[in-house]
């Protein structure tokens, strides 16, 4: 039987780099065969950070970043192929998410924008590429996110338990898998985005490795209470969010209240510890609404946040009724779940199979997501 190899490519809101996953769909369930990671080049990262913080740029700058990302994705794929000793003709298709620079599903003119020229990816790799996964769902009245729960359902559903897959990337989202219930999935809170932005601002580091900085900070109860008062947490699912809400400007507005009220300002380290608590507590608050008393509650954590020992420790402590684990313990590397999902989405698009879940996104109907860019 000819191998059904697909490559998934993902660069998320954390801007750390490009994740690549090789999936074999001749197997059921599909198997993760190999992974790779390309760090985000500093110049591209700086441009993206500036764009995401301001939400404004020139058309020329946007076009240049779009081109640069397309080349980066293509080069990353070609290096990956060399690493796993495969040729472009061995791959059925690439599923490339692109880089989200704006996601606004609830405004008068809803739109989402992912950049990274897929024409370049297809041309430079010689592999049919599927991209632009979110806009068809939004055209059908959906949120365009999250898209990964359908993949989680395929891999992790088990009738005897409630399973929740929690991805802690830049933003935290969940997939809720339960017998006799439609799968639902939605964004629940911030993930690493604020933690990474804050430590970069104050320590010049990309992220807080092993939460070493946060561990020695103290929780500011006043700040934590204000962060948890964000109206997003009161919205009913399905819902989605991103850096356009949870960013340094949002955090600084909260901190400015301390000055306005003549209260002592928390130290940068205390803010970092408070952000960890905010992340864990806002996630746990949502999960407690879902837990069952008559069966096992299993939480499978993936994404960069699963490597943060303080977040994992706090989730375990806050969720006494849950078995807290990671996707790695169930066969899918915590760092490559989303990349693997976009390989799955590409497979579904090439075979014209539905890949959104209206119960998740709120779309009017099922549809095969993505635009095909021939090689």
Curated annotation (Swiss-Prot):
Relate the protein's function as given in its record: Catalyzes the specific phosphorylation of 1,6-anhydro-N-acetylmuramic acid (anhMurNAc) with the simultaneous cleavage of the 1,6-anhydro ring, generating MurNAc-6-P. Is required for the utilization of anhMurNAc either imported from the medium or derived from its own cell wall murein, and thus plays a role in cell wall recycling.
> Which gene is annotated as encoding this protein in its UniProt record?
anmK
**Residues that hold ATP according to the record:** 12-19
One GO-annotated biological process of the protein? 1,6-anhydro-N-acetyl-beta-muramic acid catabolic process
> Which SUPFAM superfamilies does the UniProt entry name for this protein?
Actin-like ATPase domain
Q: Which cysteines are joined by disulfide bonds?
A: none
What keywords would UniProt list here?
Answer: ATP-binding, Carbohydrate metabolism, Kinase, Nucleotide-binding, Transferase
- Name of the featured protein: Anhydro-N-acetylmuramic acid kinase
User: PANTHER family attached here?
Assistant: ANHYDRO-N-ACETYLMURAMIC ACID KINASE
**Catalytic reactions of this protein:** 1,6-anhydro-N-acetyl-beta-muramate + ATP + H2O = N-acetyl-D-muramate 6-phosphate + ADP + H(+)
What family does this chain come from, according to its entry? Answer: Belongs to the anhydro-N-acetylmuramic acid kinase family.
EC number from the UniProt entry:
2.7.1.170
Which one of the record's GO molecular function terms can you name?
Answer: ATP binding
Pathway stated in the Swiss-Prot or TrEMBL entry: Amino-sugar metabolism; 1,6-anhydro-N-acetylmuramate degradation; Cell wall biogenesis; peptidoglycan recycling
Q: Which organism is it from?
A: Mannheimia succiniciproducens (strain KCTC 0769BP / MBEL55E)
